[in-house]
Amino acid sequence: MSSDIHQIKIGLTDNHPCSYLPERKERVAVALEADMHTADNYEVLLANGFRRSGNTIYKPHCDSCHSCQPIRISVPDIELSRSQKRLLAKARSLSWSMKRNMDENWFDLYSRYIVARHRNGTMYPPKKDDFAHFSRNQWLTTQFLHIYEGQRLIAVAVTDIMDHCASAFYTFFEPEHELSLGTLAVLFQLEFCQEEKKQWLYLGYQIDECPAMNYKVRFHRHQKLVNQRWQG
């Protein structure tokens, strides 16, 4: 599938405080054309550095900052690190499943996660309607990877699924759990992609200066989009 795009019509937001680097301002470019909002076109846009929030497709377009680097993993070429292999070994008693809808206990887990990890963020206080508006869309297949410890739900990874790739959209988990559940969710998403024979798993944006985001480079065989060229 070609990753080339022709010129598309975009709109620019005003500058506002950055969600990841609070001392900086951010601005995003938003795809305005309705015919770009399809699964096939979104797959091409992902390959060109775009992401979605709800039904909105966007990419960073900041005046003087280029810290947000799109990052993806080549699924057929994945090489797990020693620490990732140890994590999977420790997680042998856990199970995961991909579902079209979230477990009925999702909101209690989501609330604990937001209160513990993102009390100063835009998603606090946690609200069901806000998360539904943020995570759902009308033109793309979105499923939910659930991780269980016995019968207890401990993590949910919202996952967008296209013909040749998947995109890790958002993950929340039991904040006090002893295992690195965010990393584990990506490992299970990679397993899903292998089963479904996907080429890429997109992880969003890598931000080196943001500790909450820079775990993504620990996955070997990743590529980053630099100057509109995938490198790695």
Swiss-Prot record:
Intracellular or extracellular location(s): Cytoplasm
- SUPFAM superfamilies hit by this protein: Acyl-CoA N-acyltransferases (Nat)
Task: Provide the primary localization.
Answer: cytoplasm
Q: Which GO terms fall under molecular function for this chain's record? A: arginyl-tRNA--protein transferase activity; leucyl-tRNA--protein transferase activity
Q: What is its EC number?
A: 2.3.2.29
Task: Name the keywords, alphabetized.
Answer: Acyltransferase, Cytoplasm, Transferase
Q: Which reactions appear under catalytic activity for this entry? A: N-terminal L-glutamyl-[protein] + L-leucyl-tRNA(Leu) = N-terminal L-leucyl-L-glutamyl-[protein] + tRNA(Leu) + H(+); N-terminal L-aspartyl-[protein] + L-leucyl-tRNA(Leu) = N-terminal L-leucyl-L-aspartyl-[protein] + tRNA(Leu) + H(+)
Q: Which GO terms describe its cellular component?
A: cytoplasm
Question: GO annotations under biological process?
Answer: ubiquitin-dependent protein catabolic process via the N-end rule pathway
Q: Which Pfam families does the annotation name?
A: ATE_C (PF04377), ATE_N (PF04376)
What role does this protein play?
Answer: Functions in the N-end rule pathway of protein degradation where it conjugates Leu from its aminoacyl-tRNA to the N-termini of proteins containing an N-terminal aspartate or glutamate.
The family assignment reads: Belongs to the R-transferase family. Bpt subfamily.
Q: Which PANTHER family match?
A: ARGININE-TRNA-PROTEIN TRANSFERASE 1, ARGINYL-TRNA--PROTEIN TRANSFERASE 1
What name does this protein carry?
Aspartate/glutamate leucyltransferase
Q: Which organism is it from?
A: Vibrio vulnificus (strain CMCP6)
Source organism phylogeny:
Bacteria, Pseudomonadati, Pseudomonadota, Gammaproteobacteria, Vibrionales
**Gene that this sequence comes from:** bpt
